[in-house]
Structures are given as structure tokens and as C-alpha cells.
């Protein structure tokens, strides 16, 4: 998931209003006009994916693990188009050699393009008391642990995978 910047929130809010989408509708993404920065403070060991790893790192990891289709797309099209491809294709074979932190996700969401996107992201482990600040626009996913989120008063969330909620 990610949260919009102020400009994205305002434009999205106005667009959805002009389309007549009710503010409480399941498919409403921009429920208000504000951005949503957040600060997360770990209360226990806390695992998350946060932002995209450098392309060279992702490419090396993909090639080392035999994720050849992912490596090919990344090499030919770059990160943005690879993410779009992964999410727009409805079914992908679950990659082999998944890192430990993604195996539970793969059980819950097998053959999801979100798994390919997750392989391109930074894996972060926070210890109790550690914190991370997430600017609007920073893609992130929480994998496990207990933490407190402090964020602005906004309900704007854009989701891409690993959820039963509306995906935009």
C-alpha cells in the first residue's frame, strides 16, 4: 500500500467526487483531500517491506535466485514498468526460492503479482523502540510484529496486493 501526496489526494478526491463515488463506497480511494504521512514505532520485532531496493540489487537478487521472468522484465523495462506488469497480470506462478519473510505471504496469496513486487522491495526488521517515517508515496507492507502507527487524519490508501480491501 501507499498513501497519496497532498497534490495527489486533492486531485483524486475531486476526481472521485466528480464521478459521483460516495465517500463511504468500497471502491473509494480518496476519501478526503489530505496526504497521509505516518510514523511507525515497533513494540516488538517488526518485519516490513519499505520502498524499492536499487534496481541493480533487485536484478542481482532475481538472477541469483532464478527468477528469470522478473529479471528479464526489470532489465528491459525498469522498476516502474516491471511493477505495473506484475500487478496487471492476473496470475503469476509463485516464484521458487522465496525468502523466508515472504513464504507466509505466498501461502495466503499464491500466484499473486504482489509477490513479484515484494521481491523488489527493501526488507526491514525493526527492534522494539525502533521507528520508521513513511513519506506519502512510499510503498510499504507490514509482514509481522506489533507496532504503533502515528499518522495524519486521512483515510486515503492506495492498495496493490495482499488485501481483501479494494485494490486500486
Give the location of each predicted region.
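Active-site region of the double-stranded beta-helix
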Residues: 1-130, 140-168
Amino acid at each position: 500500500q501507499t498513501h497519496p501526496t497532498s497534490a495527489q489526494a486533492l486531485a483524486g478526491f475531486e476526481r472521485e467526487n466528480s464521478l459521483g463515488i460516495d465517500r463511504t463506497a468500497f471502491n473509494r480511494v480518496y476519501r478526503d483531500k489530505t496526504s497521509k504521512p505516518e510514523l511507525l514505532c515497533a513494540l516488538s520485532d517488526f518485519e516490513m517491506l519499505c520502498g524499492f531496493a536499487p534496481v541493480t540489487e533487485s536484478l542481482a537478487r532475481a538472477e541469483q535466485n532464478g527468477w528469470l521472468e522478473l529479471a528479464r522484465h526489470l532489465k528491459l523495462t525498469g522498476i516502474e514498468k516491471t511493477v505495473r506488469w506484475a500487478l496487471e497480470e492476473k496470475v503469476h506462478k509463485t516464484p521458487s526460492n522465496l525468502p523466508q519473510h515472504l513464504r507466509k505471504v505466498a501461502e495466503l496469496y499464491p500466484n499473486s503479482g504482489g509477490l513479484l513486487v515484494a521481491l523488489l522491495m527493501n526488507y526491514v526488521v525493526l527492534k522494539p523502540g525502533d521507528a520508521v517515517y513513511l513519506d506519502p508515496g512510499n510503498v510499504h507492507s507490514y509482514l509481522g510484529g506489533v507496532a504503533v502507527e502515528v499518522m495524519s487524519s486521512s483515510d486515503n490508501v492506495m492498495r496493490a496486493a495482499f488485501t481483501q480491501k479494494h485494490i486500486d
